[in-house]
Amino acid sequence: MRILVLALLALVPTLSHAAMTAAEFDAYTKGKTFVYGSGGAAYGIEQYLDNRQVRWAFVEGECQEGEWFEQDGMICFVYETEPDSQCWTFERGEKGLIARFENDPEAVELYEVGQSDTPLICLGPDVGV
């Protein structure tokens, strides 16, 4: 009995952080703008629009329009400047989203730093005098 209890307890973290489905991801993100971090620093910002449309910008980078879709249990993105799919798994952690880049499992994990209802402000390239 003790072994069974220990085995079940070992599964608890796995169960609490299951990959989000497309419907769960859409419900959590649509209409919001998220700031993602990595290694204690800001990484990028993504706005989730209607019809699975997105607007992404690296910190201090130009905005890219794109869309997301579900493929094999992952959330995949394509952008106007990067037509190859970039697939991620998203989980709900204690402090928000956790994203793992599945195209390269060795890549750094991203995490939600903040979210708001404010749209992502995109400046055009080479703005200024």
Predicted features by range, described:
Residues 5, 12-19:
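Sec/Tat signal peptide C-region and signal peptidase I cleavage site
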Residues 6-8, 24:
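Short helix-onset patch at the extreme N-terminus, typifying the N->h transition
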